[in-house]
Design a protein with these regions (language model features):
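Active-site groove signature of glycoside hydrolases
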Residues: 242-259
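N-terminal extension/subdomain marker
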Residues: 123-244
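Extracytoplasmic soluble-region selector
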Residues: 22-124
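Terminal, contiguous helix-loop blocks that mediate binding/assembly
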Residues: 237, 241, 263-530
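Structural recognition of the beta-strand scaffold that forms the well-ordered cores
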Residues: 131-136, 174-179, 248-252, 303-307, ...
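Bacterial N-terminal signal peptides that target proteins for export
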Residues: 1-9
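Bacterial N-terminal signal peptides
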Residues: 10-18
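Extracytoplasmic/secreted cell-surface and envelope-processing proteins
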Residues: 141-156, 184-188, 258-263, 312-317, ...
C-alpha cells in the first residue's frame, strides 16, 4: 500500500523516541598545539532589509552549523543604533534610513561570531502580480525515524525540487515556503542560498530566487509548533507584509484528517492518558489565523487556499474558510504521498501572471490526477484519487439549504438514527472510513431513501453551484460530487479525542448548526469505540 498524506489520529509515539535526539558534542579545548578543533559556524541571513513603510521589526535567529553546543545563547550588538537597534532576543528595530552591522557572538565561545548587514530603507512596498505561500509541515513524509536512510522517501524535498525545476518565473511572481514539522530534511545544499541545509530545529522562511532557481533563506525563527494558530498567523502576516500581490494563494502541505484538521508536527506531541498524540491545526484555527493576519494588512481576503493533504475537501471546512478565502482546492479522498505535481501547473502562472483561479486551480487538479491516470492505464493499481475546486462565495447558500433540510428531518434521536443509516449506506466514504466522511450527494440520496418526504433537491443544487471543477480517476460506482459531508460515526470511530463532543460542539467548527446539534446531542462518542 502506498503511503499517503492521511493524518493518523491514534499514532502512539514511545516516550523513548519522543525524548531521543541528536548526540551532542561539547567544544573541547585542544590539549596540544597540533590539535585543531573546527569551530562551529553561525548560520543566519547575511543581509537584512527593513522597510520603514512596511514591517519595521525583523528577528535574527542564528543557528550553529552543528550540534556542538546545547541550547546556544548569543549576544547582539548594532554598530549604529540611530539606524537600527537590536534586542537581546535578536529583534531588530528599524529607526532611520541607513546601514548598520549587527554583530552576533556565541556567548560560550567568543571566537564564534558573525556579522549581519542591515539596510533600512523608506520605500513604497513592492507589489506583485502573484504570490503563492507554501506552509510545509513535512512530518514523516520527509523523514521517518523508524526507517533506515535508504528507505526514506523525502517527499517534501521532492516537492521543493519540483518547484525549483520551473525556470524563468517572472519577478512579479513570488513563491514562499515555510519549512518545519519533521526531524530531518534532505534538501541538498546546492539548492539553497544563505544556509547549508534546511533546519529541523528551527522554523525557516524561504523565497524562490527566480534568477538562480534556488531557495533563498529569508528568516530563521525559533521553533514553535506548526500546528498552532499563532505560527500560521505569523506565516500569513509575513507574506502579506512583504509580498502582497494582486492574487495570493495559500497551500497547506502535510497530513490531513478532515474535520480533525491538517498538518501535524513530529517535533510536538501531547500526552493524553498513556498515549502521545500529534496535534493538528484545526479549521477554526486556520480561520482565526487568517482573520488576524488580514486585519493588519491592506486586504480582507486571500484568493485561494489549497490543501496538499488527505481528505480535506469537506463542506464544514469550506463554510469556515469562506470568510477569508475566495476559492478552495482539496481532495475528498486520501492523497498519495507524492502530493501535487508542482512542475506541471506552475508554468501556467509563469506564462500568465494574471491567470484567474477559475483557470489555475483546475490545472492543479488535472496535474495531480495525471500520474494516477497513468497508473490505471498500466494496470499497476486501482486508483482512488480525487481533486476538486470550490467557489466559496456559494458556501452560504449550502449552509442555508442544508440547515433547512435538517430542520425538516428533525433534531432528534430518531433523526440521528436515520442519518446514521444513510451514512452507513452511502456509496462513497473516504479516508478508510475512519474520519466519518462521505460524499455529500450520496449522503443526501440515502437520507431521502430513509425519509422519502425529504426534498434534497435544493441542497444538491447548492452543491453543484459550490463545486466549479472536479476530477477523479476513482473506481467508485457513483462519481464523487466534489465535496464531503461529515458525520461522526458511532462504531469503530477514531475521532474520539480529536473530534469528539468537545470539538464538534465548538461553535467555530462548522456552520451547519442544526446538523451539529443533532450529532453532538445524540451521537455516541467515547473511548470504548476505538
Amino acid at each position: 500500500m502506498r503511503k499517503n498524506r492521511l493524518f493518523i489520529l491514534a499514532t502512539l509515539i514511545p516516550c523513548s523516541l519522543a525524548l531521543s535526539g541528536c548526540f551532542l558534542r561539547n567544544i573541547i579545548e585542544p590539549q596540544q598545539d597540533d590539535i585543531v578543533v573546527d569551530l562551529p559556524k553561525i548560520e543566519v541571513v547575511n543581509n537584512l532589509k527593513i522597510n520603514l513603510q512596511g514591517r519595521t521589526t525583523k528577528s535574527l535567529y542564528p543557528v550553529l552549523s552543528n550540534n556542538s553546543v546545547k541550547n546556544p545563547e548569543f549576544s547582539f550588538t548594532s554598530s549604529n543604533n540611530s539606524v537600527a537597534t537590536v534586542g537581546s532576543d535578536g529583534l531588530v528595530q528599524g529607526k532611520a534610513v541607513g546601514t548598520t552591522n549587527i554583530s552576533i557572538v556565541l556567548k560560550s565561545n567568543e571566537n564564534v561570531k558573525t556579522t549581519v548587514k542591515v539596510n533600512v530603507v523608506d520605500e513604497v512596498v513592492n507589489h506583485y502580480d502573484y504570490t503563492i505561500m507554501f506552509y510545509m509541515c513535512a512530518s514523516d513524509l520527509e523523514y521517518n525515524s523508524e526507517k533506515q536512510e535508504s528507505e526514506q522517501n523525502h517527499f517534501f524535498t521532492q516537492d521543493i525540487q519540483e518547484i525549483l525545476s520551473v525556470h524563468d518565473i517572472p519577478d512579479t511572481v513570488k513563491i514562499l515556503i515555510e519549512t518545519g514539522g519533521t526531524l530531518h530534511w534532505s534538501m541538498p545544499s546546492t539548492s539553497l542560498e544563505g544556509a547549508s541545509k534546511i533546519s529541523a530545529t528551527n522554523l525557516q522562511r524561504w523565497e524562490v530566487n527566480n534568477g538562480t532557481n534556488k531557495l533563498r533563506l529569508v528568516e530563521t525563527l525559533p521553533y514553535n509548533q506548526m500546528a498552532s494558530e499563532s505560527s500560521f498567523s505569523e506565516f500569513l502576516s509575513w507574506g502579506l507584509d512583504d509580498y502582497e500581490a494582486d492574487q495570493m494563494g495559500v497551500v497547506m502541505s502535510g497530513h490531513g484528517g478532515g474535520i480533525a484538521g491538517c498538518v501535524y508536527d513530529d517535533n510536538y506531541t501531547t500526552k493524553v492518558g498513556n498515549q502521545l498524540w500529534q496535534r493538528t491545526l484545526r479549521t477554526f484555527e486556520v480561520a482565526g489565523a487568517a482573520k488576524t493576519a488580514l486585519a493588519n494588512s491592506n486586504r480582507d481576503r486571500f484568493t485561494w487556499i489549497g490543501y496538499d493533504c488527505c481528505v480535506m475537501q469537506v463542506a464544514d471546512i469550506a463554510t469556515i474558510n469562506a470568510d477569508y478565502f475566495d476559492y478552495m482546492i482539496a481532495s475528498q479522498e486520501n492523497e498519495i504521498a507524492t502530493g501535487w505535481n508542482h512542475d506541471l501547473y506552475l508554468p501556467m502562472i509563469k506564462n500568465n501572471t494574471h491567470v484567474t483561479p477559475e483557470v489555475l486551480l483546475p490545472e492543479i487538479c488535472d496535474a495531480f490526477l495525471l500520474d494516477n491516470h497513468r497508473e490505471v492505464e498500466t494496470g499497476e493499481e486501482i486508483c482512488y484519487q480525487t481533486q476538486s475546486v470550490l467557489d466559496l462565495s456559494k458556501a452560504d447558500a449550502l449552509v442555508t439549504s442544508f440547515n433547512n433540510l435538517v430542520n425538516h428531518l428533525g433534531v432528534s434521536a430518531v433523526a440521528y438514527n436515520k442519518a446514521e443509516t444513510a451514512f452507513k449506506n452511502s456509496l462513497n466514504t473516504f479516508g478508510d472510513k475512519i474520519f466519518g466522511l462521505c460524499d455529500f450527494s450520496s449522503l443526501l440520496s440515502k437520507l431521502q431513501g430513509v425519509d422519502p418526504l425529504l426534498d434534497v433537491s435544493e441542497v444538491k443544487e447548492a452543491i453543484n453551484d459550490l463545486v466549479i471543477y472536479k476530477n477523479n480517476c476513482s473506481k467508485y460506482s457513483v462519481e464523487p460530487c466534489g465535496v464531503n459531508a461529515f458525520f461522526p460515526k458511532t462504531l469503530n470511530s477514531k475521532y474520539i479525542l480529536q473530534v469528539g463532543k468537545e470539538d464538534y460542539s465548538n461553535s467555530l467548527s462548522t456552520k451547519f448548526t442544526k446538523w451539529q446539534n443533532m450529532c453532538v446531542t445524540y451521537g455516541r462518542f467515547g473511548w470504548d469505540y476505538i
